[in-house]
Amino acid sequence: MKQDSRFPNLFILDHPLIQHKLTHMRDKDTSTRTFRELLREITLLMGYEITRNLPITTKRVETPLVEIDAPVIAGKKLAIVPVLRAGVGMSDGLLELIPSARVGHIGVYRADDHRPVEYLVRLPDLEDRIFILCDPMVATGYSAAHAIDVLKRRGVPGERLMFLALVAAPEGVQVFQDAHPDVKLYVASLDSHLDDHAYIVPGLGDAGDRLFGTKN
């Protein structure tokens, strides 16, 4: 895991397996089926990395030999909140890693001026819960920042929120950081820039279209 000095709340997950799978996802000739499988696999690997600092407590258990105080994750079960629609493809990998997690959804689409338009919010109970929000792309950063706003407006503090994405543009990371300097943003790659259509370069195309086999 490494950081970029420009963005103190950005963490780049540079594990070789994550980078290997991301390269195959970038390839324009990767099939929908393979893209979907890779998204699940890479999200599972990234989920392992971002949960390494979860709070721990102990639980009394009896092994076949003795009783011990053994470590377990403290507090309520985690919640996974994909940003629709492409974020849904990331929830499978996270649920494979954390099968007891609660799942919410935030529906946001990008208007012609690239600003987010919210159309759906479904969340589990919020008290004392850690939330992992996920969307494959942080392009302009407005949708990601808006999704965090949804939780904060309902009283969830920044220290109980994290955002997980595959690739991000510096422009989007700056927007996210300006809006939520107290929320950690985890990505597999910080790419070069946004083009004139607000697509990430080099990026991996439209993640939703590639995941579901649709045409923009």
UniProtKB/Swiss-Prot annotation:
Pathway: Pyrimidine metabolism; UMP biosynthesis via salvage pathway; UMP from uracil: step 1/1. InterPro entries: PRibTrfase_dom, PRTase-like, Upp_B, UPRTase/APRTase, Ura_phspho_trans. Allosterically activated by GTP. GO terms for biological process: UMP salvage; uracil salvage. It catalyses: UMP + diphosphate = 5-phospho-alpha-D-ribose 1-diphosphate + uracil. Disulfide bonds: none annotated. GO terms for molecular function: GTP binding; magnesium ion binding; uracil phosphoribosyltransferase activity. Its cofactor is Mg(2+). Belongs to the UPRTase family. Catalyzes the conversion of uracil and 5-phospho-alpha-D-ribose 1-diphosphate (PRPP) to UMP and diphosphate. PANTHER family: ADENINE PHOSPHORIBOSYLTRANSFERASE (PTHR32315), URACIL PHOSPHORIBOSYLTRANSFERASE, CHLOROPLASTIC (PTHR32315:SF4). This is Uracil phosphoribosyltransferase. It comes from Burkholderia pseudomallei (strain K96243). The gene is upp.
